[in-house]
């Protein structure tokens, strides 16, 4: 965690772990923050690695936070909790999210939909559902998949 911000306080680290949905699994590790992570994070799951990376970014309190497919290894419920926590941050940063998961973008001020490298649509979630067939197809296919898996889209 100190790779994100040297000299970060325990409170700052705990806040970043809470927001990134990492606190529970970090608290379960022997030694907690002194737990040794192997080269490449081999002793962590993909979702744990992603959440710790997000925590390291959050602990810096950036003005701009870029999340590039940051939830690909997270289940739908954890992804939703992460998005909600980021929206609720004090002095919330400007967040750019690159995602193939439509649910990760639902509350964005502006969504840009790309199809074969070209802009297929721009707008809010509701605007795109009404006016962009590419976005609507992606959203509906992912929403049906989440329902069948018992998750939240």
For every predicted segment, state its role.
Residues 99-101:
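Conserved H-loop
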Residues 59-63, 92:
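A short, proline-enriched helix->beta-strand linker immediately N-terminal to the Walker B motif
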Residues 45-46, 52-57, 81, 97:
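ABC ATPase nucleotide-binding domain "signature" region
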Residues 28, 32, 84, 88, ...:
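C-terminal portion of ABC ATPase nucleotide-binding domains
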Residues 75-85:
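Conserved D-loop/post-Walker B switch-helix segment of ABC ATPase nucleotide-binding domains
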Residues 85-97:
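Conserved catalytic loops of ABC-family nucleotide-binding domains
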Residues 23-52, 67-70, 74-77, 144-153:
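ABC-fold ATPase nucleotide-binding domain signature/coupling loops
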Residues 1-39, 83, 92, 152:
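ABC ATPase nucleotide-binding domain helical subdomain, centered on the C-loop/LSGGQ "ABC signature"
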